[in-house]
A protein has these predicted regions:
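Glycine-rich flexible loops
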Residues: 1-203
């Protein structure tokens, strides 16, 4: 039985992801780690309408009865938890960011908040990009150095100590992508409006 507070955390983040257009009806997944256990969205569940039975518990290392119901991208979440100190993972399909990933090798925010929160988001390419070991290894390796990365044409993976934190990076990425789109549509020369401190540029 899933703890009520844990359920509410999953429900609220899932709903926020859907409301913010970070996923389609059945897309994306989220998870948290507790020691050697993982709680993850059920395969096929709708993030915008999560129920307690849509949260599946399974092992970080070993399969058990829950693995058959877990998200198809459980392998990626496991790899991320093994490679990083993350306690939460948010995987989304943000539309403008997906479009940018098809033409860029990294997404570099041009707005102040995006630059401060993310600086840049690398775009990772793999030959087989749906729940494969190749995909899991590539994403996990990139997240050793970044808190949010993008799988080309697929979606974002963000880590945090909480789901709120991982959601923040995801939402900031899509907002930054939207601002890039607006600026490109203006078709005018960008005006440099800020200078970053030395500590920021070395980060």
């Amino acid at each position: 039985m899933i703890d009520q507070r844990v359920y509410e955390m999953f429900r609220d983040i899932g709903r926020d992801m859907y409301v913010h257009n970070l996923v389609s009806s059945h897309g994306g997944n989220i998870s948290v780690r507790f020691g050697d256990r993982i709680l993850i969205k059920r395969r096929g569940a709708m993030l915008g309408r999560l129920k307690p039975h849509d949260i599946i518990e399974t092992g970080l290392e070993k399969n058990d009865s829950g693995v058959a119901l877990a998200s198809t991208e459980l392998i990626v979440h496991r790899a991320i938890y093994k490679a990083t100190p993350a306690l939460a993972v948010v995987h989304a399909h943000p539309r403008r960011s997906i479009a940018l990933s098809l033409v860029r090798d990294e997404i570099v925010p041009i707005d102040n908040e995006g630059s401060y929160l993310l600086k840049k988001v690398p775009v990772v390419s793999v030959e087989f990009a749906s729940g494969t070991k190749q995909m899991a290894d590539a994403i996990a390796d990139a997240l050793r150095s970044y808190k949010c990365v993008f799988l080309r044409g697929h979606g974002s993976f963000a880590t945090g100590q909480t789901l709120d934190e991982a959601f923040q990076w995801t939402d900031a990425l899509e907002e930054a992508a939207e601002i890039i789109f607006y600026a490109k549509q203006l078709n005018e020369e960008m005006i440099e409006y800020r200078r970053m401190s030395d500590s920021y540029t070395k980060w």
